[in-house]
Amino acid sequence: MRNPIDTFERWLIQSDGLGYADVAMYREFYKGEHDIRLSKRQETRLGITSAQIRSLANICPLVVDTVAERLSVQSFAATSPATERALAMWWAARDLSTYQDDIHLSALRDGDSYVIVEWDDAAVMPEFHHEMSYDGSNGTGIIYSSERRVPLYGFKKWRLEEGDDRGRARLNLYFDNRIEKYITGRAGAWTEYHDGERWPIPWVDATGQPLGVPVVHFPTNPNGDDYGTSELEAIIPLQRVLTSLWVDLIAAADATGFQLVTLTGDVPSEEMVNAARAIWYSQNPAAAWGTIPPGDLSLLVEAVRHATMTIAQVSRVPLTMFQDSRAVAAADTIVASERGLIAKIADRAKTYGLSWRRVMRHAVRLHNTFGPRPALDEAGIVTNWDSFEELDYLTLEKSRAAVAASHLSNGLSMTAAYTLAGYSAAELAAIARTDTYGEEGLTQ
């Protein structure tokens, strides 16, 4: 039998240097915990904490969530109708329509996510466990063969936080034909973990053939590599710039954003507080009053806008999602602005679709080994996605009409109001031809 220490050392050597430490950074930036900190003097001077400034300037969730929200598996197709029905039943029974959101989001944020497929004897069906990517301390991963891109084994490592073994670490290694479980001893050495099952747990079918590694990998944009790339990989440097610009803008606004009153020839009293409607005076005939005009903040404001625009370009998320505007774009404009985003979502769906197919193939294999008859055919399983397009024309029209009505109530002409609301010249002409929406009716 394989020495557990040798097994773990092999895992440790092969998994070293795979960039797991970056996963923790991606999660911190997603939560707004950036590595830019205000000094105590800045916090006191600006009246704002490091946590508040990071929350104010945090764009990372939008970059991830915009893609994750549009990735939704609709159903699975298969060569066999019986297989299709089984997949649909498992999907509904295991609430995977909800759990898929967490799987996709963590894959986009961390670069990789995982699903472990096991068999549930009580429910007589497969069960699916979403596992987070390994961050150097806890999590799941896969080790691939250096010769061919095939999984050698998967792993899950975690720290126990309850029970008699609290403070000890657990490690499961998932091979294609067995599962090995380990736990650290009191001295920190790894030993076999026995929970009433055979050790190692056989992972083979009725004929003794391997069932395959039950850990399924969901990589994001692997670019031919074994592992994925976080959506935040290229955004974090820009996020640091944006956060720093916000600090500069707030500091500049506090120091030079308002007109200052000057006094020469006298000493100001404590009652001279720069407040609204305050009246200052001096009884000294030599006193002279003056003002220092507010500083020009437009360059810093433009720098913030440019950094935001660069993030939009790099992430291929439409700029309109980063900025608030009363003007509503026309439908054609929205479609054009989302082409890059839709292309990225479709690319991610291709990769995740293959992963979902592996999940369901493994589930069928477990059903055929441990479940009731008849056996299911795993051939031809295909992942079907909901539409990636999010354009709701009825909602768009309601929004545009509301914006137009707001402009009209402020006294704008019909042409100006509807142009600002995103209506094209052809749409304006059609509106003007109707009795209900004529110029007179709209401005009454």
Features from the language model and the residues they span:
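Long, highly charged low-complexity segments enriched in Glu/Asp and Lys/Arg with interspersed Ser/Thr
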Residues: 421-444
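Short coil/turn segments at secondary-structure boundaries
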Residues: 103-106, 118, 253-261, 321-326, ...
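Extended, charged amphipathic alpha-helical segments
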Residues: 193-336, 373, 379, 384-393
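Periodic self-assembly scaffolds
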Residues: 388-419
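A glycine-biased, small/acidic residue-tolerant capping/turn segment at secondary-structure junctions
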Residues: 358-385, 429-432
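Long, contiguous amphipathic alpha-helices that act as assembly "spine/axial" helices in icosahedral shell
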Residues: 48-62, 67, 86-119, 222-263, ...
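Extended, helix-rich architectural segments
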Residues: 1-129, 444
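Extended, regular secondary-structure scaffolds
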Residues: 108, 114-223
